[in-house]
Regions:
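C-terminal motif of bacterial Sec signal peptides marking the signal peptidase cleavage site
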Residues: 20-23
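Low-complexity, intrinsically disordered segments exposed to solvent
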Residues: 33-332
Length: 332
């Protein structure tokens, strides 16, 4: 039986999942599976931007809040607080971090671990190829321990397509499934300088995603660098996403540090869990906060599945003295 995702995340955050990763139930996990294919720490990209805390003000709050939420660069006009009435149709859609993670998660879920069981060997190695939902392929080598369900492997993507997004490159993985190979307990993806293209947007991504699954929630940890087509590198560091799946929605609690190459870093946290219904791309409600230097902060409020708003404390005194007009999620 192929392990499949119970439901898709629709945000991150729509930020990691967010993650369709939570798809499988089971208990928590720990450590790697060992073997010749144990992935190594990615080192291909380097963050060379500002490493001090960002000073959040009325000019950069919307950009920083939305970037921290999405995990990378958003439309540049957000810094000007474009309202619904005057939003620019030319703002290019940026790929959200959770969409990136979903791509790899979906590919990993296509591996039929149960097919690698049943012979007399406790530890066995298998090779196969899976096809993308909209083209391309991903070939993998996986070594699985039949006795305890641990596995480790390497997957190579060749224009692998899902949701009209294409990826090429290599990712190592390891983790553990239940002894009957029906559910993931935990897994780690080590993404090594993979090229990602969606429409006219292109990125190079490098980093790690770890997921512990425990019904009805899962916890994902993300540390990832993303380089856009202009050459700027953004960094999401120690992002933790606690994901709870309801009947027709996903609730996400997010925390972590986001590094913007121009402004510096902000610390992201959740005031109210973000809720995304499975039929929607964006959250219907929830509230996130970023904090920068000297207590300056901004809050991102989801009004509904179409609109959000940013509140800003430019003085660090706890009073929000600036508020944007309603902003369309699509501007992100």
């Amino acid at each position: 039986m192929i392990i499949t995702s119970n439901k898709n995340f629709g945000l991150l955050l729509s930020i990691v999942c967010v993650l369709g990763l939570v798809a499988c139930g089971g208990g928590g996990g720990g450590g790697g599976g060992g073997g010749d294919f144990m992935p190594v720490e990615p080192t291909g990209l380097t963050y060379a931007g500002v490493t001090s805390p960002a000073v959040i003000d009325s000019n950069n709050a919307a950009e920083l809040a939305s970037d921290a939420f999405i995990g990378g660069e958003t439309g540049s006009n957000l810094g000007m607080f474009s309202s619904v009435a005057d939003a620019q149709s030319t703002i290019e859609r940026k790929i959200k971090l959770y969409e990136v993670v979903q791509l790899f998660d979906g590919a990993l879920h296509k591996i039929d671990f149960s097919n690698h069981r049943g012979d007399l060997l406790a530890v066995k190695t298998e090779q196969d190829t899976v096809i993308g939902d909209c083209g391309g392929s991903a070939s993998y080598t996986v070594e699985m321990n039949d006795l305890n369900g641990t596995f480790t492997g390497l997957m190579t993507f060749n224009d692998y397509c899902n949701g009209n997004t294409f990826i090429s490159g290599t990712a190592g993985f390891y983790g553990q499934v239940t002894v009957d190979a029906s559910e993931f307990l935990y897994f780690n993806l080590s993404i090594d300088m993979i090229n990602l293209t969606s429409g006219d947007q292109s990125y190079v991504i490098d980093g790690d995603v770890s997921v512990d699954v425990e019904r009805p929630s899962s916890t994902a940890t993300v540390d990832m660098l993303m380089k856009d087509s202009s050459g700027e590198v953004f960094w999401v560091k120690d992002y933790t996403l606690t994901i709870f799946e309801g009947v027709d929605y996903t609730d996400v609690d997010i925390s972590g540090r986001f590094y913007h190459p121009t402004y510096g870093y902000v610390d992201l946290s959740t005031i109210l869990p973000v809720r995304i219904f499975y039929i929607d791309q964006w959250p219907s409600f929830g509230e996130l906060q970023i904090v920068g230097e000297d207590g300056t902060k901004a809050r991102l409020l989801a009004i509904d599945k179409n609109l959000c708003r940013i509140m800003v404390d430019t003085n660090g005194d706890g009073t929000y003295n600036f508020e944007t007009d309603d902003i369309s999620w699509s501007d992100f």
